[in-house]
């Protein structure tokens, strides 16, 4: 399901964080993220969307390409420009490598950037973004499918600890 609690604040760009693909299709978690991003983008048709996610060895396309294909197929009337960040393999890299695209588009880190991810992932993604210098993050949280919610939150708990130990962010910023 899609979070109906979509902020009305205008972002300069929308970063959609990848979350796995299966045989060239977005996972249920990723579909929810893309649907949430599309609902926001429909309100602001000129802002840049950045799809983030690299390629696994067993997939022919990067996550970013699959995400773009899903948006074009599911939301054909959406006219937002889309850029692909297709090298990343982690949340930290999603955000880091997207900065290159933002700079190319003359979008600074002080500008409002919407980061679309899952509800369980939002706090850590926001902390990593702040640590990397993003100064104005608008969190767009997609709901997690009921049948995988427990496992997702449990995995995120350990990722939160790991990220802190690896200095991907500070707990007290």
Segments the model singles out, each with a brief description of its role:
Residues 1-154:
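A structural signal for short, hydrophobic/glycine-enriched beta-strand patches
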Residues 153-172:
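A transmembrane-helix-recognition feature enriched in membrane-embedded lipid enzymes
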């Amino acid at each position: 399901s899609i979070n109906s609690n979509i902020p009305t604040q205008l972002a300069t760009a929308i970063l959609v964080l990848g979350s796995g693909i299966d045989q060239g299709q977005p996972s249920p978690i990723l579909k929810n993220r893309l649907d949430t991003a599309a609902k926001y983008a429909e309100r602001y048709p000129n802002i840049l969307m950045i799809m983030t996610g690299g390629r696994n060895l067993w997939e022919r396309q990067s996550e970013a390409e699959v995400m773009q294909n899903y948006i074009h197929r599911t939301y054909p009337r959406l006219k937002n420009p889309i850029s692909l960040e297709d090298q990343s393999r982690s949340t930290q890299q999603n955000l880091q490598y997207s900065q290159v695209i933002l700079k190319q588009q003359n979008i600074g880190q002080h500008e409002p950037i919407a980061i679309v991810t899952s509800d369980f992932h939002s706090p850590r993604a926001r902390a990593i973004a702040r640590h990397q210098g993003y100064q104005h993050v608008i969190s767009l949280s997609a709901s997690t499918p009921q049948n995988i919610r427990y496992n997702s939150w449990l995995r995120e708990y350990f990722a939160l600890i790991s990220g802190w130990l690896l200095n991907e962010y500070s707990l007290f910023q």
